[in-house]
């Protein structure tokens, strides 16, 4: 077993912090390792930021190592301290439900071969399994005794909270719970490497120390960069202040695809390195195309396709690609099934057209928000910039016929090349 996985993580830019990489490389060369990453159910779904550590687990598995994915049923009831203040504690049944949903998502990203026959089939665990039976006395004696307050106060987030609004003992103790997870996984499964986001470094190192002090073993830590755009914005925040969720009911496959196809040239190659398994030569070719022929957006299209297949599957990806092409005039709208068309349009502005409402094209442009006024709508029509169902409208007197409504219900309005809205007949 070679340490080539570390070389791959290096050229992909996926190592933010680590314990001694030479020592880790030596252990990787000695044989398969067991590697873990944990994910707290603080929401009903994982989001795009979780993909980077998840895919690093997958990269380790492809290199012959065994991944453990941990759903934080216990730690999710506490919440990792953050700068903006105390978290609202969720009910136990809510956390349990979210943990089950997230467990199902985690299982899609690693391979579950027969553990009895395979040396690197994935394991999924919930830390509630060992945390729940532990009494307060056991926790303080077996875990808390190994930590000094000075060490815990050294974490940046803790220090900032203490200098501001303060922090509860509940959140202050989160580090100990996560550290104990590492010790438990080392004892149960021989886990010797924890992976997480760079904001988890303090918690992960606490686990490394606990394993050394309590069990006398040397284990390793590696963090990946947090996912941000070139301007420093968190990935997905342009979706209206929320996250890009992996659950298709929270972020539709169409919205997911559109987000990544609109990635900036400054970010797209980095995201391809982080989120895909493309080889170096493929990435070089896409980077060269982005520089020489940026209008083709070849890298963006590849990124959107790869990530949508990864999260939503090939069939959903084919449907959203077809919908995307059709909405922007590069395919036949009539070939879209109604569910796909409706989902795509609901990611835009949809105006309702009720019986008796004005239905002229000028009225529809204003109602949909594509034009700020009737005068602006008329000017856009005169300039040839308005299309309905990809057919250019040449008269401001145009009104839709029954046969114009796709599936008897929908009109697709477009102003210019990229401004789209839907009209739904109700």
From Swiss-Prot:
Its main location: cytoplasm. GO terms for molecular function: ATP binding; RNA binding; tyrosine-tRNA ligase activity. ATP binds at residue 237. A motif ('HIGH' region) lies at residues 41-50. It is an enzyme of class 6 (ligase). CDD domains: S4, TyrRS_core. L-tyrosine binds at residues 36, 174, 178. It is found in: Cytoplasm. It comes from the Bacteria. PROSITE patterns: AA_TRNA_LIGASE_I, S4. Belongs to the class-I aminoacyl-tRNA synthetase family. TyrS type 1 subfamily. Homodimer. This is Tyrosine--tRNA ligase. It comes from Mycobacterium leprae (strain TN).
């Amino acid at each position: 077993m070679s340490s080539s996985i570390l070389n791959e993580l290096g050229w992909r830019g996926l190592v933010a912090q680590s314990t001694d990489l030479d020592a880790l490389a030596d252990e990787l060369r000695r044989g398969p390792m067991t590697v873990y990453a944990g994910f707290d159910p603080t929401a009903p779904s994982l989001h795009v930021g979780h993909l980077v550590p998840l895919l690093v687990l997958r990269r380790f598995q492809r290199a012959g190592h065994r991944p453990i994915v941990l759903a934080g049923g216990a730690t999710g009831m506490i919440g990792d301290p953050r700068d903006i203040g105390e978290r609202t504690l969720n009910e136990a049944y809510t956390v349990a439900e979210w943990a089950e949903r997230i467990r199902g998502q985690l299982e899609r990203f690693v391979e579950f071969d027969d553990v009895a026959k395979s040396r690197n089939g994935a394991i999924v665990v919930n830390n509630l399994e060992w945390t729940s039976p532990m009494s307060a006395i056991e926790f303080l004696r077996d875990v808390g005794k190994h930590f000094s307050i000075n060490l815990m106060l050294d974490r940046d987030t803790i220090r900032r909270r203490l200098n501001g609004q303060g922090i509860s003992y509940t959140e202050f103790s989160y580090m100990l719970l996560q550290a104990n997870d590492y010790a438990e996984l080392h004892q149960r499964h021989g886990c010797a490497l924890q992976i997480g986001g760079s904001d988890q470094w303090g918690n992960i190192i606490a686990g490394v120390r606990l394993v050394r002090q309590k069990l006398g073993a040397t284990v390793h830590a590696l963090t990946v960069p947090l996912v941000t755009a070139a301007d420093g914005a968190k990935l997905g925040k342009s979706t209206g202040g929320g996250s890009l969720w992996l659950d298709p009911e929270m972020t539709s496959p169409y919205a997911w695809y559109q987000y990544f196809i609109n990635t900036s040239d400054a970010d797209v190659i980095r995201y391809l390195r982080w989120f895909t398994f493309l080889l170096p030569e493929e990435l070089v070719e896409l980077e060269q195309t982005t520089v020489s022929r940026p209008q083709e957006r070849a890298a963006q299209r590849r990124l959107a396709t790869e990530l949508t297949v990864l999260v939503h599957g090939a069939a959903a990806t084919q449907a959203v690609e077809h919908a995307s092409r059709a909405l922007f005039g590069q395919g036949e709208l009539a070939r879209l099934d109604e569910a796909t068309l409706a989902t795509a349009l609901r990611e835009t502005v949809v105006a309702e057209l009720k019986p008796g409402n004005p239905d002229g094209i000028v009225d529809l442009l204003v109602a949909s928000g594509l034009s700020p006024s009737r005068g602006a709508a008329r000017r856009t029509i005169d300039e040839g910039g308005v299309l309905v169902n990809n057919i250019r409208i040449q008269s401001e007197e145009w009104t839709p016929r029954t046969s114009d409504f796709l599936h008897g219900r929908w009109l697709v309005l477009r102003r210019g090349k990229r401004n789209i809205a839907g009209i739904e007949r109700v």
